């Protein structure tokens, strides 16, 4: 049976929009929500840990923590074309 499951992780991440006409051109941050949706067949193998599941929620959460949260939470992400911010961050 094909089904979908969804998990998310939230981060607090800083950035700026260098050429924006508003205050967004200044360094600031947001609360971001990253969502992963997985679609596939339910595991029908008898006796395995994931039996009756598409994937264990805890496994998805571990992946999201490792690949997203631990990378960008309380971090500052910089647009590669933002030479001014990149130069400033080189001195930190």
Where is each model-derived feature located?
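Charge-rich, low-complexity N-terminal segments
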Residues: 1-92
